[in-house]
């Protein structure tokens, strides 16, 4: 633990030096960061009732879904977890552009197709990709270097610009 603490302290001590020299901090301010939207984790579960009972012990509350269809979404504060039985093979990290943590539609946000174009320009491959010719709800998926799936799933109309 001491070495971890030293590592964090060394990192934190380095930050002002980079900012003062105009290095990484200056470059980061030149481009607006992507706003990926509301984040949740979608878990592939073997027994949805057992998983639901477990997460309820952690004070998660069901906020969406249909238990009879074997999928529910639970929330505790800003943490949101989807439980899905038999719907997909692996766990998925999900970003919902245009949604707040309470599934309220944001007035201004980055459309899923805008996020897709940015990621494509950075060399990331989509599988599947969102149709660039459409507006409104759409999704695309990517995988990180370890094969973890990230889903960008927009449920709301595109922002008016």
Tell me the role of every PLM-derived stretch.
Residues 71, 80, 92, 139-141:
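Short hydrophobic/aromatic beta-strand element in the GNAT-like acyltransferase core
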Residues 65, 84-87, 132, 151-159:
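Short beta->alpha transition motifs characteristic of CBS
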Residues 46-49, 87-88, 95-149:
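Vicinal oxygen chelate
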Residues 76, 85, 95-97, 154:
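Residue-level recognition of conserved beta-strand positions in structured domain cores
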Residues 35, 42-87:
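Core segments of cupin and vicinal oxygen chelate
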Residues 40, 92-94:
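Structural preference for beta-strand elements that scaffold enzyme active sites
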Residues 3-7, 16-49, 155-161:
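N-terminal beta-strand motif that seeds the catalytic metal site of vicinal oxygen chelate
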């Amino acid at each position: 633990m001491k070495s971890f603490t030293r590592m964090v302290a060394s990192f934190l001590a380095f930050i002002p030096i980079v900012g003062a020299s105009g290095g990484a901090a200056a470059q980061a301010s030149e481009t607006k960061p992507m706003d990926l939207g509301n984040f949740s984790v979608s878990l592939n579960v073997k027994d949805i009732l057992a998983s639901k009972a477990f997460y309820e012990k952690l004070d998660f509350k069901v906020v969406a879904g249909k238990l009879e269809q074997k999928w529910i979404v639970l929330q505790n504060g800003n943490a949101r977890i989807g439980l899905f039985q038999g719907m997909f093979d692996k766990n998925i990290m999900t970003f919902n552009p245009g949604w707040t943590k309470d599934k309220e539609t944001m007035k201004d946000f980055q459309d899923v197709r805008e996020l897709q174009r940015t990621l494509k320009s950075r060399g990331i491959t989509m599988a599947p990709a969102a149709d660039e010719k459409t507006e409104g709800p759409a999704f695309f998926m990517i995988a990180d270097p370890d094969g973890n799936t990230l889903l960008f799933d927009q449920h709301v109309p595109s922002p008016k610009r």
